[in-house]
Swiss-Prot record:
InterPro entries: Kinase-like_dom_sf, Prot_kinase_dom, Ser/Thr_kinase_AS. This is Probable serine/threonine-protein kinase KKQ8. GO terms for biological process: intracellular monoatomic cation homeostasis. SMART domains: S_TKc. It comes from Candida glabrata (strain ATCC 2001 / BCRC 20586 / JCM 3761 / NBRC 0622 / NRRL Y-65 / CBS 138) (Yeast).
Length: 766
């Protein structure tokens, strides 16, 4: 027999290896480490693994480069330092002083689960702004995912081929090395995410419900298989016990938050009582009235004192009588939309084009109520309009026309209402120059239903919840608000000028709040793409006499402030670290979207952050937002003056003679919001030197020691993730804004890259 045929025969005898079996099992053509094909033979998501070589030793070509980091680089972390002479920080509590004490050691994870196992300790860190700390890039050991709840390793972890004798077995039962799927493709993320959705029929827009079972395409095939292993016939990965529709092991089960062994989590926030019961008081489910969002204490005797806020959808919930609700319906009955439309339909959320503004050619068309838009294209080419140089800006030509349109209608409506103030005959008459009543236009109740509750009070009016019966036309993809199995809900904010407010000032505020919110929440609707999931959807603007009505998406879990206060009162603790990290990432993503389109919020605080029961976060209240770059501007323009609520205001805002970047102000405010989530109280009341002793202490320690004792004493579920978070906090809280980290870079830090979020952002355009 020729030599080459003998070698071939010998190779055939050795072909009964598990490598061939694995190729048959997963229908992979080649075995080159992780498979590039799914279980059905179609290309699956790429498994990105960063392989590094230690050039110091060629013999360790495939050995991970490991840098050991001491368990505690700073001995002061072992024992909290107590600073004498400082005011009691508990005075900054969001809750009464007689509430349960706050836990300083962080929320426990599980009695039988090691906290060190919950977060992978791998990372490639960004530049550390603290010169006293070691900011070298470190890589940790890649530990297999074990059955006791350890999380998978990060995709950037330095790993080498596994030559152990049981590596194939570990792959089959799911305990082998599997890449951490944070920020993977959306399809890959969804396949790996085990979902515990809302009760049947409930839906929150922007939240993608993943399938029950994870994907099989993530199981890698190996070329270094063992010899002589018996193998079964070809089966699908779904038939393996690991990939059956068996939910993952829950390692942390709280009333409001669940954590699973693969690292994903589920929020189970309470729904308002007003949503659980209809106007007749018929309960739709068994939610408790003491759901943690109602009847917040208020007063001067150590109880909750909110920062000044225009509105809150859940903060001051009070039950209202049927008579109050009937009066509200009577007022809303005559409300007329101020938005010009090219088409009227009976169901507002079933057609996206319904809310696309139709901009008229001249102001005479606006005053006459004409909806003629045939010359829109010609108007866009008008030489009097500056050339658009920033197509990503949220405020462009159409928004400018809508601003002029609404401002004119609001001014005329208020002027006419003032003249008819004492005329009883004008009680149910729409003011001249405002929205023109049309017998073909559907009534308010047909579009948004009837009032079921009054859930908020503010300086300019009240916030109500309206609901109507859900029908087959209310398809989920087009709907921009909350619904259950029977009804669809809308938040309705009434805005009425105070006697001391000039008409021009009130008109500017309404127009600014509506235009910014509407343009951001509908930015991608023009192109038929998915909109930003963390921006509250603004739907319509209507008028009745001197009252203006803004219709918005309804978030039935209330605002973040109410959640923090209720949690502190009920269990005496702030949010779980992983829960707060998820909210932090969503908040950063939402503000990143705003900044990418030329808008800074300038008033970020828990009262302006709304929540859905599944944990989906929504940013609201754009009344004080700053448009720092329009479609006609190439460069960012700064601003001056104090904006926002005191505990969240950045230090540079207190200098009236100096301009500041509003984007960096938002970053500072986000840091305060996060610390409030994990500590249960503000860091300080005022970030101006000489006005607050706590801020003075922070400033002096940062200047002398490059650290702040409050940040040093914070604890997370894992020492490494705690270190990464601490680095990010120091980058956020830079008193000098020129040294402060941006939102984009903050999302690239190791802390945020390790944070698993409820919303898959990979395929959502920025």
């Amino acid at each position: 027999m020729p030599e080459h045929e003998e070698r071939h025969s010998h190779g055939v005898n050795r072909s009964l290896s598990l490598g061939s079996s694995m190729r048959s099992l997963f229908k992979s053509q080649r075995s080159r480490g992780p498979s590039d094909r799914g279980a059905n033979g179609t290309p699956g998501p790429a498994q990105k693994v960063d392989i590094r070589v230690d050039t110091a030793s060629a013999s360790r070509e495939h050995t991970p480069v490991v840098h050991k980091t001491p368990q505690s680089a700073n001995p002061e972390l072992q024992q909290p330092r107590h600073h004498l002479g400082l005011p009691n920080i508990l005075k900054l509590n969001l809750t009464p002083t007689n509430s349960n004490p706050q836990s300083k050691s962080g929320s426990p994870v599980s009695q039988n689960t090691s906290q060190e196992s919950l977060i992978t300790d791998t990372d490639i860190e960004v530049e550390d702004y603290r010169p006293s700390k070691d900011s070298r890039r470190t890589v940790r050991n890649a530990s297999p995912m074990s059955s006791n709840g350890n999380l998978p390793i990060n995709a950037n972890t330095v790993i080498g081929p596994d030559t152990s004798s049981n590596n194939i077995d570990s792959m089959l039962d799911g305990t082998g090395l599997r890449p951490f799927y944070e920020e993977a493709d959306s399809s890959d993320y969804i396949e790996n995410l085990r979902s515990f959705p809302l009760p049947t029929g409930h839906y929150a827009p922007g939240f993608i419900q993943p399938p029950k079972s994870p994907t099989s395409s993530r199981v890698p095939s190996r070329s270094n298989s063992r010899k002589g292993r018996e193998h079964a016939g070809t089966v699908s990965a779904a038939q393996l016990p690991r990939y059956n529709e068996t939910p993952g092991k829950c390692i942390l089960d709280l009333e409001y938050f669940k954590l699973y062994e693969d690292g994903h989590h589920v929020h189970t926030l309470k729904v308002m009582t007003s949503v659980n019961s209809d106007a007749n008081g018929n309960s739709h489910n068994h939610a408790s009235k003491n759901d943690g969002h109602l009847d917040l204490p208020k007063g001067d005797d150590g109880s909750v004192v909110r920062q000044k806020s225009k509105f809150s959808l859940s903060g001051f919930f009070k039950p209202h009588s049927k008579e109050d609700i009937a009066n509200a319906d009577e007022k809303l009955k005559y409300a007329v939309s101020l938005l010009p439309r090219n088409k009227i339909c009976s169901k507002v959320e079933t057609d996206r084009d319904t809310f696309a503004p139709v901009f008229t050619k001249t102001r005479s068309h606006v005053q006459s109520g004409s909806d003629d838009s045939s010359d829109d294209d010609e108007e866009l080419d008008d030489p009097s309009i500056p050339k658009i140089v920033n197509k990503n800006a949220a405020v462009g030509s159409q928004e400018l026309k809508l601003i002029n349109n609404l401002s004119e209608k609001i001014r005329m409506g208020l002027s006419t209402a003032a003249k008819n103030k004492h005329n009883q005959s004008s009680k149910h008459r729409t003011p001249s120059g405002a929205g023109v009543q049309d017998e073909n236009q559907p009534a308010f109740a047909d579009l948004y239903g009837k009032c079921v509750a009054v859930v908020g009070h503010g300086a300019y009016g009240v916030v109500k919840v309206c609901a109507r019966t859900r029908d087959e036309k209310d398809d989920l993809p087009a709907t921009k608000t909350y619904m259950d199995s029977k009804k669809i809900y809308f938040a309705v904010k009434e805005l009425k000028p105070r006697p001391s407010d000039p008409i021009e000032k009130f008109s500017t505020r309404i127009t600014s709040e509506f235009i910014i919110g509407h343009s951001l929440s509908h930015y991608y609707d023009k192109n038929g793409e998915q909109s930003a999931p963390n921006i509250l959807s603004i739907i319509d603007l209507l008028e009745y006499n001197d009252t203006f009505i803004e219709v918005m998406e309804f978030c039935p879990a209330g605002d973040l402030y109410s959640l923090l206060t209720a949690r502190k009162n009920k269990i005496g603790k702030p949010l779980h670290p992983l829960e707060a990290d998820c909210f932090m990432k969503q908040l950063l993503k939402g503000i990143q979207f705003m900044h990418d389109h030329g808008v800074a919020h300038c008033d970020l605080k828990p009262e302006n952050i709304l929540l859905h029961p599944n944990g989906l976060l929504k940013i609201c209240d754009f009344g004080t937002s700053c448009v720092f770059q329009t479609a006609w501007e190439r460069h960012v323009h700064f601003q001056t003056g104090l904006q926002g609520s005191e505990p969240y205001v950045a230090p540079e805002e207190y200098n009236p003679k100096k301009e500041y970047d509003p984007r960096l102000v938002d970053c500072w405010s986000i840091g305060i919001v996060y610390c409030t989530m994990i500590m249960g109280h503000y860091l300080w009341r005022n970030a101006a030197r000489g006005k607050d002793s706590l801020y003075d202490s922070f400033y002096e320690e940062m200047a002398s020691k490059k650290e702040f004792y409050v940040f040093e004493e914070l604890r997370h579920i894992n020492q490494e993730i705690n270190r990464l978070r601490r680095i990010a906090l120091y980058q956020i809280f830079q008193p000098n804004p020129e040294k402060r980290i941006s939102i984009d870079k903050l999302l690239q830090t190791g802390w945020m890259r390790h944070t698993k979020c409820c919303v898959p952002y990979k395929n959502i355009p920025r």
